A protein has these predicted regions:
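Histidine- and aromatic-rich ligand-binding microenvironments
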Residues: 7-8, 36, 92-94, 131-134
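Phosphate- and divalent-cation-binding pockets in alpha/beta enzyme and binding domains
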Residues: 42-43, 76, 120-121
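Acidic, PIN/NYN-like endoribonuclease modules and their adjacent C-terminal/linker elements
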Residues: 2-4, 101, 105-134
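Active-site neighborhoods of divalent-metal-dependent phosphate/nucleic-acid chemistry enzymes
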Residues: 65-112
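A generic structural signal for well-ordered alpha-helical segments
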Residues: 28, 59-60, 104, 122
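Short, well-structured N-terminal submotif of metal-dependent ribonuclease cores
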Residues: 1-38, 45-58
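Active-site-proximal, substrate-binding regions of enzyme catalytic domains
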Residues: 51-72
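Alpha-helix capping/helix-boundary segments
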Residues: 11-12, 39, 73, 100, ...
């Protein structure tokens, strides 16, 4: 695997549950799998209790390179949603999905996911996506 990845929450959950396999462990350890703010916030929202929140946040910051959204992110998410609407599939993508897809496009990353919505986005945009599980 020679590509770099932006991990979505759906894949991040599988990774931390140890469902992803050793290939992904190696890629994460090598710094080839990054994280963006919408995913960090969505993941941490599900963490129970204050100590667990800070422990999980520290771990995310230590393990994953951070990919920031560029200034045009909102205009680009609007354009992506319109592109999906033109294809009749705009209801598939949540605001977080749109942000993840656009941030990945901005940095030329492959979206690492376990969410059929990214497959739908990829069919419309042609952007690279990969499922963390098979």
């Amino acid at each position: 695997v020679s590509e770099d990845f932006l991990i979505d929450t759906s894949a991040l959950v599988r990774f931390y549950r140890r469902q992803a396999g050793s290939e992904w462990d190696r890629l994460v350890e090598s710094g080839r799998v990054g994280l963006c703010e919408p995913v960090r916030q969505e993941f941490l929202r599900a963490v129970g209790g204050r100590p667990a929140y800070y422990e999980a946040d520290d771990l995310l910051r230590a393990v994953f390179p951070y990919w920031a959204a560029r200034d045009a992110v909102w205009a680009e998410t609007e354009a992506l949603q319109r592109q999906l609407a033109d294809a009749g599939v705009h209801q598939c993508a949540s605001p977080v999905d749109l942000l993840v897809a656009v941030i990945a496009q901005q940095h030329r990353l492959t979206v690492l996911h376990q969410d059929a919505d990214f497959e739908t986005i990829a069919r419309v945009t042609g952007q690279p996506v990969r499922r963390i599980l098979g």
